[in-house]
């Protein structure tokens, strides 16, 4: 009798457990079904061409935006370390490596979606010489400019107390207490405009050479590490000639943060100092990018996919 009772109890427990598992499974499937039904219903409302258009436009726009936010936030952050007199990190070497690493992280984040241009000079050069669709140029450049502005704004939120501690709440563009250089690029006082223009043109030309060579199909060992090679190239260019211009090589990297400083308290004189130097990092890198790709033409490297 005891054995029979035990067997009945075991069978009943097994049946209850099976029933509970079945109920939990049904509940889970019901929840998943409702979620996926909503998702699929929304997805079905877009036909294939619409989804493709959305992915081709908005995903690339967001990738360029986020990548440029990261690039500018980190690059200007390294500049802040130099400006705010954090002595253990105060050197051009630190700033140069910071620029390279910032670009590398931006490439890692957005490269698989948009190609990680992160730079209007790159986008324009690719459009003219390497078959990048002209219809995408406005979207890319807009994303880059907005991303640069947003990156500067985010950095300001983070380091604003340190800036106040350094300048006493007075926003200086020039002088020992200048903090505008955290965001925009400004050459040393002893450097002429001509030298700064030459530095930006040559630096951007070399940057485009590095991008095109490392991305060429015949350079397989380099293509797999293209982001790292570009970052190393930027670091090297900065160490060699970057100090003469403040080192921009990127119109978005300078214009976005400079515009932010104009709004955030430094005033629109940030566009006028050094005889309207703001025009140099705005246009010289674009010319430099074109020069860089023109130098590649004799070597038939223009088959690189932008």
From Swiss-Prot:
Motif (NPA 1): 119-121
Topology within the bilayer: Multi-pass membrane protein
GO molecular function: glycerol channel activity; water channel activity
GO cellular component terms listed in the entry, alphabetical order: plasma membrane
CDD domains: MIP
Keyword Transport: yes
Span(s) of short sequence motif NPA 2: 250-252
Regions that span the bilayer: 60-80, 93-113, 146-166, 193-213, 227-247, 279-299
Pfam families linked to this entry: MIP
Region (Disordered): 1-24
Topology Cytoplasmic: residue spans: 1-59, 114-145, 214-226, 300-306
Record keywords, A-Z: Cell membrane, Membrane, Repeat, Transmembrane, Transmembrane helix, Transport
Residue ranges, Extracellular side: 81-92, 167-192, 248-278
InterPro entries, sorted: Aquaporin-like, MIP, MIP/Aquaporin, MIP_CS
Induction of synthesis: Expression is high at the spore resting stage and further increases about 1.5-fold during spore swelling, up to 90 minutes after induction of germination, followed by a 6.5-fold decrease before and during polar growth.
Origin superkingdom: Eukaryota
Family: Belongs to the MIP/aquaporin (TC 1.A.8) family.
Biological role: Water channel required to facilitate the transport of water across membranes. Contributes to water uptake of spores during the early stages of spore germination. Aquaporins AQP1 and AQP2 act as extracellular pH sensors and enable the spores to hydrate under favorable conditions and to commence germination. Wounded vegetables and fruit present acidic pH, so the optimal pH range for germination is adapted to the relevant host pH.
Protein name: Aquaporin-1
């Amino acid at each position: 009798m005891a054995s029979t009772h035990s067997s009945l109890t075991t069978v009943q427990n097994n049946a209850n457990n099976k029933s509970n598992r079945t109920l939990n499974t049904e509940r889970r499937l019901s929840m998943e079904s409702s979620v996926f039904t909503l998702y699929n219903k929304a997805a079905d409302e877009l036909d294939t061409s619409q989804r493709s258009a959305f992915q081709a436009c908005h995903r690339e726009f967001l990738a360029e935006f986020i990548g440029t936010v990261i690039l500018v936030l980190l690059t200007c952050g390294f500049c802040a370390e130099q400006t705010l007199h954090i002595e253990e990190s105060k050197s051009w070497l630190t700033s140069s490596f910071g620029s390279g690493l910032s670009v590398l992280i931006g490439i890692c984040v957005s490269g698989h979606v948009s190609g990680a241009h992160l730079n209007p000079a790159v986008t324009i050069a690719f459009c003219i010489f390497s078959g990048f669709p002209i219809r995408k140029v406005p979207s890319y450049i807009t994303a880059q400019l907005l991303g640069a502005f947003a990156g500067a704004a985010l950095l300001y939120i983070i380091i604003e107390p340190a800036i106040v501690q350094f300048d006493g709440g007075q926003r200086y563009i020039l002088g020992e207490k200048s903090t505008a250089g955290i965001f925009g690029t400004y050459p040393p006082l002893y450097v002429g405009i001509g030298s700064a223009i030459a530095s930006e043109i040559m630096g951007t030309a070399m940057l485009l050479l590095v991008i095109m060579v490392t991305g060429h199909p015949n350079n397989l060992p380099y293509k797999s590490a293209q982001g790292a090679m570009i970052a190393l190239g930027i670091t090297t260019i900065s160490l060699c000639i970057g100090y003469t211009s403040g080192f921009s090589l990127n119109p978005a990297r300078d214009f976005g943060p400079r515009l932010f400083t104009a709004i955030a308290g430094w005033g629109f004189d940030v566009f006028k100092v050094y005889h309207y130097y703001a025009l140099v990092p705005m246009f010289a890198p674009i010319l430099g990018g074109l020069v860089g790709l023109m130098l590649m033409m004799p070597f038939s490297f223009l088959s690189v996919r932008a």
